[in-house]
């Protein structure tokens, strides 16, 4: 199930998706331009694949992944440390009534995709995919 769908199967509103994309672009731009002066963040390239907004648009869950998947905990700690600065920068770049509070999470989709790829490359699955039957 995609992250933007509720457990009831309803999809996210277009406004939540649009605001999430605006916040994602703002955070990615701030991080790529070196707007945060932190030794950990300055030495890592960080991707921001998704931002999920709460229904009232006051909370943004920002999914991040350091390039290569290394040093996730120090990067997450540095982002949490500079959360207030990032919130202010997002407020300046995105025109909203309230600046959303930022919550940072590591994006697990890359690890999950790698796990599925490894599973698909196993001999048992390859045998099933090639159409060979065991008798």
Curated annotation (Swiss-Prot):
GO terms for molecular function: ribosomal small subunit binding. One of several proteins that assist in the late maturation steps of the functional core of the 30S ribosomal subunit. Associates with free 30S ribosomal subunits (but not with 30S subunits that are part of 70S ribosomes or polysomes). Required for efficient processing of 16S rRNA. May interact with the 5'-terminal helix region of 16S rRNA. One of its GO terms (cellular component) is cytosol. GO terms for biological process: maturation of SSU-rRNA. Pfam families: RBFA (PF02033). This is Ribosome-binding factor A. It comes from the Bacteria. Its main location: cytoplasm. It is found in: Cytoplasm. Monomer. Binds 30S ribosomal subunits, but not 50S ribosomal subunits or 70S ribosomes. Belongs to the RbfA family. Keywords: Cytoplasm, Ribosome biogenesis. Gene3D superfamilies: 3.30.300.20. InterPro entries: KH_dom-like_a/b, RbfA, RbfA_dom_sf, Ribosome-bd_factorA_CS. The keyword Methyltransferase does not apply. PANTHER family: RIBOSOME-BINDING FACTOR A, CHLOROPLASTIC-RELATED.
